[in-house]
A protein has these predicted regions:
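Rhodanese-like catalytic fold shared by cysteine-dependent sulfurtransferases
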Residues: 1-21, 27-59, 68-105
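Short, surface-exposed ligand- or partner-binding patches at beta-edge/loop junctions that are enriched
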Residues: 63-64
Length: 105
């Protein structure tokens, strides 16, 4: 599984293509409080149920609050046979907020 930092995701944001997806695996309440623009929310406990729909994306960037849930979700998705998953760790949305980067509410 490929892993990148949230800083690297921030760097890549401007180059994301329509066939890339940012998957926020926090709870709906956390997501609604603030999320990365364009991100889709599916709580980490439910990601396996959307695995088939994720196959159409070139890259699926999985992130959460700090990185723990993202790692679990990415591993579960890889267990379904997906090879397009990138785990985003090293701070997650907490680091995003700390850096003052824009969130959508």
């Amino acid at each position: 599984m490929d892993c990148i930092s949230i800083d690297e995701l921030h760097h890549r944001i401007k180059r994301l293509r329509p066939d890339d997806l940012i998957l926020d695996v926090r709870t709906l309440e956390e997501f609604l409080a603030g999320h990365i623009h364009g991100a889709q929310n599916t709580p980490h406990e439910e990601v396996v149920s959307i695995a088939d729909t994720l196959r159409r994306y070139e890259t699926v960037y999985v992130h959460c609050k700090m990185g723990g849930r993202a790692k679990m979700a990415a591993q579960e998705l890889e267990g379904t046979g997906l090879s397009n998953v990138v785990c985003v760790g090293d701070g997650g949305i907490e680091r995003w907020i700390e850096m003052g980067w824009v969130l959508k509410k």
